Amino acid sequence: MIGELDRQDRVAEPHYMNRDERPAADFVAALASEIRGVLGDDLVGLYLYGSSVTGGFDPGVSDLDLVAVTSPEVEALDLDALEQMHHAFVGRYPEWRDRLEIVYVGRATLGSFRTSPGSLAVISPGEPFHVRNERVAEWLQNWYLVRETGICLFGVDIAAIVPPITWSEFLAATVRYADEVRNQSRLGAGDGVIAYAILTMCRALRTVRTQTHGSKQEAAAWTRERMPEWAWLIDEALACRLSRGTAGFEDERSRAATETFIALLDDEILGRATNRM
């Protein structure tokens, strides 16, 4: 099925938000100004994507997703200055602590992401600012979404940097990531990690079945309707997400059920299960 869906004109989301009405617009503008101040002429472009652009953004809960493209490779940037800026900025806006995902990537690396050995510098929820040496091709889902749905906050059009990515490539990456989530160890993991895994798998299944990429909330509702016997677990994941990991999954029943549910969804995604939806 995946091989038959090779449409470059497919959009990732069925709806878009007005740029002037996006959530946290003042915060985003201030953060963009800080990033520009540190990078100066090294900044090629800065792009906002994710739920703050395409919908499903929950104030006080959702992350902000940004990609900063730079003219040099990330190893040549003043990473200490960027880290200090992140720390100071979140200190002024503590409600955004652990809610920023900013990816810094060199223009040449992003432009040839399928084959490039280049690195990324990333700050993300639960992780400090650091250089990641994994293949940038593993971030294909991000590159697709920022290219198809992102808002340019500064610089050149992202389509002039990221080469075209087909829907079938995005879909295949979604399937691979779902399988990775299934195989991750969640022994002793925090409640937020478990909720993220459940909702990520719901979204992956909905993406494969409906051929559209939507929000976690849309995916949860879609899966809940089709698998009512698992509604209680999906609801627990949603409640945990809204509490930012402070509520939910407090008993072994929920945690054990999580692994069963994730395996079931992964089998559905990979087409190994009986078609039941």
Give, region by region, the residue ranges found by the protein language model.
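Helical scaffold of the NTase/Pol beta-like nucleotidyltransferase catalytic core
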Residues: 2-5, 9-47, 77-79, 276-277
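Nucleotidyltransferase catalytic cores
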Residues: 9, 152, 156, 160-277
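Soluble or luminal CAZymes and related metallo-dependent hydrolases
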Residues: 23, 27, 81, 253, ...
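Catalytic metal-binding acidic patch
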Residues: 48-86, 99-104
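Conserved NTP/Mg2+-binding pocket subregion across the NTase superfamily
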Residues: 15-16, 84-191, 198
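Glycine- and acidic
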Residues: 14-18, 68, 243-248
